[in-house]
């Protein structure tokens, strides 16, 4: 929306300069090199850095004054311009300011340039200040500067097949827009930096998030190799399984129908087979056949399990098996996922194209997907993950004596929990008891209800209630911590991690019980999940620095919540394992040991 009260390029006096020859570029370099802070931006031909070619470079060092250097399309000519500015980008004394600077970092890597020195990313700064809001520049400019930026769509048209490339426009049409980007980014930095200080987020920003940018940039640009033959095999196997399940479902239903249609599934289950007396219906009178509803009815008929299996396999096929080959970059032969640093509300990384965080690990079919991720030719796949880090953080935060003792003694925490709840010796604990204790451990610390626990364990509500009571009796510190967490958020309005990352939870004072309950669970969960995210980020930064310092050629390739994965040269095997485990275990001093488990193999599945 155009807001009459907002300033814009049309209303604000500004000095934006277009530079299109080497002589002027050299002169600009000499001027910029004397400055301590440099705001930068790149204009390119693609939003995917791996394939992006430079169209122009923008710089700003004073507010409302910026420069745009047009880059020729011929690569050799382009490199002449880039090389003029290379010593500027690589000068460790000059701070670099950017909006989503990881992208510019990657694009410049394509031209043999690696940004050095302190970096300030306005997107990440705002993510720490207000995790749940938008962090794009157009939004930030409106909120913090009351300024309406030139939107890229105004230049190249709306997204779609007719959208132009920046390359198609004359530099004279582009330079004001591009220079504005660098200028606004600098102005945003000047507004956001004091806010980081005010909210005690400086340490998290400068020591954790910003040093992580180069780590992620290298992971994204390096990409991951995929075993396409293994993927084809998985595709054939899963498709055959689907056909079999389909046949079985038709048999049980006594007729064939479209299993992918919720409406038809509802009519078969509730209309024809009458699995329950009073099935749930939507406003339009259609039967509800959501995952949640079907999970609750599993014991009623074998057809339900089969329908759930069918849906799971179908999703696996479409999300991963059939889409992974399409994501392989034709030039590099690898997939290059994006690791997003400013998306989740808890501080965890997320990934997209493909979403590596969502590959199911609990079922055998999901695990097969991991078999298709392989190391670089001649290398081994190495996987290291934190052992029960969330419970260890809980032990640290709650200072519960029983939980702390179990971890310090190196006991199996779930067996130890079972032993305490059922007053058994740890050696007498059965598998079934351990499984229940495990469900309790992870469920209860995230505020699971009696009903939720009963469902998850497939037991009566009465027994679930007893288990929760026994659990809190066993770990009184945990109960106290949970109450205290909620109290803190009620007072402050936000939860905090060990590194002072914030998560705002205004709903904790809501009059609606469901909404309030959700916020209360997050008050308990956010410090745990957020601290886990902080810790693994610190480990990643330290591992990356040590690989560099010790001249390790092996590479970190995938991060998933509490695990790190590497492609490793055989001759570096021992060294890599030692560095990774050491840095993961020493990333933060909890009052219980941090433990990392390591595994090797020829692919992700074998190593994990």
Segments and roles (model prediction):
Residues 114-130, 144, 410-414:
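Conserved beta-strand -> loop -> alpha-helix junction used to position metal-binding or nucleic-acid-contacting
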Residues 91-99, 108, 370-394, 405-438:
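Conserved catalytic alpha/beta cores of large enzymes that bind or transform nucleotide phosphates
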Residues 1-73, 90, 99-101, 132, ...:
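Conserved "right-hand" nucleotidyltransferase catalytic core of DNA-directed polymerases
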């Amino acid at each position: 929306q155009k807001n009459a009260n907002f300033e814009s390029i049309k209303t604000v006096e500004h000095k934006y300069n277009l530079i299109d020859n080497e002589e002027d570029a050299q002169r600009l370099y000499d001027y910029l090199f004397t400055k301590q802070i440099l705001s930068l931006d790149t204009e390119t031909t693609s939003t995917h850095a791996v394939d992006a070619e430079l169209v122009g470079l923008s710089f700003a060092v004073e507010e409302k004054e910026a420069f745009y250097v047009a880059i020729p399309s011929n690569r050799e000519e382009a490199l002449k311009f880039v090389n003029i500015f290379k010593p500027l980008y690589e000068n460790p004394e000059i701070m670099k300011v950017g909006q989503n600077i990881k992208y510019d970092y990657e694009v410049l890597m394509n031209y043999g340039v690696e940004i050095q020195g302190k970096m300030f990313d306005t997107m990440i700064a705002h993510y720490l200040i207000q995790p749940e809001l938008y962090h794009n520049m157009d939004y930030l400019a409106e909120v913090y500067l009351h300024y309406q930026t030139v939107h890229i769509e105004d230049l190249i048209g709306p997204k779609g097949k007719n959208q132009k490339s920046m390359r198609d426009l004359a530099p004279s049409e582009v330079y004001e827009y591009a220079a504005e980007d660098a200028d606004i980014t600098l102005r945003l930095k000047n507004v956001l930096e004091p806010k980081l200080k005010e909210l005690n987020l400086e340490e998290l920003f400068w020591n954790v998030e910003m040093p992580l940018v180069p780590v992620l940039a290298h992971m994204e640009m390096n990409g991951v190799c995929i075993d396409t033959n293994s993927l084809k095999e998985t595709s054939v196997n899963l498709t055959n399984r689907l056909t079999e399940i389909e046949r079985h479902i038709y048999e049980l239903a006594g007729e064939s129908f479209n299993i992918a249609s919720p409406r038809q599934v509802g009519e078969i289950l509730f209309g024809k087979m009458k699995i329950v007396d009073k099935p749930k219906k939507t406003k339009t009178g259609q039967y509800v056949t959501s995952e949640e509803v079907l999970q609750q009815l599993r014991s009623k008929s074998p057809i339900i399990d089969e329908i759930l299996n069918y849906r799971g396999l179908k999703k696996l096929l479409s999300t991963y098996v059939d889409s992974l080959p399409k994501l392989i970059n034709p030039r590099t032969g690898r997939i290059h996922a994006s690791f997003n640093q400013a998306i989740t509300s808890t501080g965890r990384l997320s990934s997209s194209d493909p979403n590596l965080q969502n590959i199911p690990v609990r079922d055998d079919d999901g695990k097969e997907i991991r078999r298709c991720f392989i190391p670089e030719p001649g290398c081994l796949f190495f996987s290291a993950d934190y052992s029960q880090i969330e419970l260890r953080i809980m032990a640290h935060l709650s200072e519960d004596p029983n939980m702390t003792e179990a971890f310090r003694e190196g006991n199996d925490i779930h067996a130890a929990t079972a032993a305490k709840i059922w007053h058994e010796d740890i050696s007498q604990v059965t598998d079934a008891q351990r499984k229940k204790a495990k469900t309790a451990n992870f469920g209860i610390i995230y505020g699971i209800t009696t009903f939720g626990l009963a469902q998850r364990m497939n037991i009566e509500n009465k027994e679930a209630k007893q288990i929760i009571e026994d659990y809190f009796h066993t770990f009184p510190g945990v109960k106290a911590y949970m109450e205290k967490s909620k109290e803190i958020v009620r007072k402050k309005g936000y939860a905090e991690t060990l590194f002072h990352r914030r998560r705002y939870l205004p709903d904790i004072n809501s009059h609606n019980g469901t909404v309030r309950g959700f916020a209360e669970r997050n008050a308990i969960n956010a410090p745990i999940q957020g601290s886990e995210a902080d810790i693994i980020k610190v480990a990643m930064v330290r591992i990356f620095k040590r690989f560099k310092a010790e001249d390790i050629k092996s590479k970190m390739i995938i991060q998933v919540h509490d695990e790190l994965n590497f492609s490793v040269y055989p001759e570096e095997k021992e060294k890599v394992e030692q560095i990774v485990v050491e840095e993961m275990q020493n990333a933060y001093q909890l009052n219980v040991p941090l433990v990392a488990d390591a595994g090797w193999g020829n692919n992700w599945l074998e190593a994990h």
